[in-house]
Amino acid sequence: MASQLTDAFARKFYYLRLSITDVCNFRCTYCLPDGYKPSGVTNKGFLTVDEIRRVTRAFASLGTEKVRLTGGEPSLRRDFTDIIAAVRENDAIRQIAVTTNGYRLERDVANWRDAGLTGINVSVDSLDARQFHAITGQDKFNQVMAGIDAAFEAGFEKVKVNTVLMRDVNHHQLDTFLNWIQHRPIQLRFIELMETGEGIELFRKHHISGQVLRNELLRRGWIHQLRQRSDGPAQVFCHPDYAGEIGLIMPYEKDFCATCNRLRVSSIGKLHLCLFGEGGVNLRDLLEDDTQQQALEARISAALREKKQTHFLHQNNTGITQNLSYIGG
């Protein structure tokens, strides 16, 4: 195996977020309020199963232990189960997760688990069906809830739920969410609304710091847990009276980037060193053939020398990210 991916600031990278499409069938207000609009990439332009097999093999060789499949909505790909199986071929990758809007969970989650999926994140921004419809543009709340139940029935011991925290939308609904997870092994993750190129006005109107929730959780006796090396950026809290957990993702907090352990590859094969960075490093020309793996690993390793110490969100610099469907949030 090649040496562990490490950047100039001694951060080690165990976690790959791999976007497999930027297409989504939801119209979430904070991401794609006007719906998906193709950006010159046809469905045939997204990474193929063989290309995904090659890129994840290279990352596995470079020490990656966890791969998260993102989008867009990953399950819109008809070959999604084959993609999971292709990633599963790498013994070094211990965790394969997906972030999904959940609309196909009930139908397909058992097949995904059989193919090798080990973790699920479902986006649920409200537990009120009408508000869910207003946020997502889809009247599928009950379908998504049934999908979460189906995930437990398929054998997943825990389901993570992502909730984008928005002032005057859901920030005051903590008790409703806590009641929901009291007897369910759900890790509910509140994600601070992040500014993107297309979402400046929404950010100014609805952003609220996750510190407000953290202070309230600590006041109620919730306990901050230690992170594992392949965990994502959430600060996780538990409570003896709850089966579920609470996670807080606060990208505007001081030193948020100090524990960065993840890299991103877009659905068209570009390596992105930061969600809010510029440009990206093209990998696709080295995904054509199995004989290119050594060169692929070398390019990935070399690119890390350019990773910045921190994002520049505090300076309102959102980089290339116009919306979160582009490289998977």
Curated annotation (Swiss-Prot):
Cofactor mode of binding and number, as noted = Binds 2 [4Fe-4S] clusters. Binds 1 [4Fe-4S] cluster coordinated with 3 cysteines and an exchangeable S-adenosyl-L-methionine and 1 [4Fe-4S] cluster coordinated with 3 cysteines and the GTP-derived substrate.
Q: Where does [4Fe-4S] cluster 2 bind?
A: C257, C260, C274
Specify the pathway. Cofactor biosynthesis; molybdopterin biosynthesis
Alphabetically sorted, this entry's keywords are:
4Fe-4S, GTP-binding, Iron, Iron-sulfur, Lyase, Metal-binding, Molybdenum cofactor biosynthesis, Nucleotide-binding, S-adenosyl-L-methionine
* Residues at which GTP binds: R17, R68, T99, K160, R262, L263, R264
User: What is the recorded function of this protein according to its Swiss-Prot or TrEMBL entry?
Assistant: Catalyzes the cyclization of GTP to (8S)-3',8-cyclo-7,8-dihydroguanosine 5'-triphosphate.
Q: What is this protein called?
A: GTP 3',8-cyclase
Q: Which organism is it from?
A: Escherichia coli O45:K1 (strain S88 / ExPEC)
Gene responsible for this protein: moaA
